[in-house]
Amino acid sequence: RRQRQMCIRDRRIVFKGVNRHEFSSKTGRAVTREEVLKDIVTMKQNNINAIRTCHYPDASIIYDLCDEYGLYMIAENNLESHGSWDAAMHGSVPKDTIVPGDNMDWEPMMLDRVNSCYQRDKNHPAVLIWSVGNESYGGKVIFDMSEKFRALDPYRLVHYEGIFNDRRYEATSDMESQMYTSVENVKKFLAEHKEKPFIMCEYTHAMGNSCGAMHKYTDLTDTEPRYQGGFIWDYIDQSILKKDRYGKDFQAYGGDFLERPTDYNFSGNGICYGGDRDPSPKMQEVKFNYQNISILFEKEGKFTVVNKNLFANTDRFRCVAVLQKNGVVVKKQEIETTVPPLSTKDYEIPFAILRADDKDQKKDPDAEYTLTVSFRLKEDMSWADAGHEVAFGQKIYKKIPAFHASEKPIRVVHGKVNICLLYTSPSPRDMRR
């Protein structure tokens, strides 16, 4: 660790990760090699660089594929006792009933699990961090589990989030790890606690039409050096293949089996669909926020390339600038870029019509011009063909008409599941004022 940061070859790492359960809609927890390979390839294509195995060691094939394709891993031990400590936190049972807590009767079995986790996966270079387990509060037994990992492997870091609820054994985790903390509270914690690097082991819960505010977290990696990314909850919808009354297959969730009570579709919180394991629309947001090259349009007549890759120069990629008018491509040009890792460089916008000093061409004042600068693979890779887009930035050039606000107040209406804003649009006569 350098300056309380996690580093690889002395370069600060940012985890652009996902939590991934072992799940198939056809075979349950027994996932095939083909399904795992599709997951890995999809992750690589969408700029995901890390997996947290939640909340148990996965089948060995995924460790092999992460080694081969180049994904980092938090390898998690098989432990979660959510029910025991959750009840204690709410006061319904005494805290001394928490498992494993400080009950040393549990320690031999827990240390055996740690040893098994380590011995099986110790030779996988993809594994950067060992995780003691998930959501099991704190206590002496869990601290001893972390110490067992360190005794077995003095080179890797140890992770555990549960000390967030029990600070008696802070040394259990080598990093501060939290779940679903707001951006403002992350900033507040970093300002007040400077002892460790910080990750979100679970964040941007991907249920329903979600991930829209994800950038508020990923932007933090640029402004808070000790904030080093997070792991989306979670990767794939946990749905089960079922036939409807017409014999047609569909992906079923809670309640589709006539069971009550149920959590309904609460297990459908992935960025990939169950079944075919294809990306859902949420993946577009993930890919953009996780991209390792940023393109900014903050300087007149120029665009800025920010290379966030730890080891790759931008000359490994084709840089293509595309000019569109009202959605129709009118010009396209390749640009040679050479931006070293963790560096920034400005380039001239190649289309004169978009520059303020353009004297030869006149923009159509009513048209919308769009400049898109993208970076694409030059060569075929094991996970994508040449031409696959790894990053892009875009700016829209359009004259925006003045907005005429209503003079009448906006009324807020609170429904059972929605909040509505009601207002009266200004009349044409009002707009002429």
Question: Where do the language-model regions lie?
Answer:
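Extended substrate-binding grooves/exosites of carbohydrate-active enzymes
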Residues: 2-5, 9-300, 304, 308-315, ...
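Low-complexity, Pro/Ser/Thr- and charge-rich linker/hinge segments at domain boundaries
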Residues: 2-5, 9-12, 393-414
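Single conserved hydrophobic/aromatic residue that forms the stacking wall/gate
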Residues: 3-4, 8, 423-432
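Acidic glycine/proline-rich low-complexity segments
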Residues: 178, 218-220, 232-233, 237, ...
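Hydrophobic residues positioned within well-ordered beta-strands of beta-sheet architectures
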Residues: 301-303, 319, 347-349, 371, ...
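Solvent-exposed loop and beta-edge segments used for protein-protein assembly and interaction
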Residues: 313-315, 341-343, 363-367, 387, ...
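Intrinsically disordered, low-complexity Pro/Gly/Ser/Thr-rich segments with frequent PxxP/GP/PP motifs
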Residues: 328-364
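Terminal connector regions
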Residues: 357-401
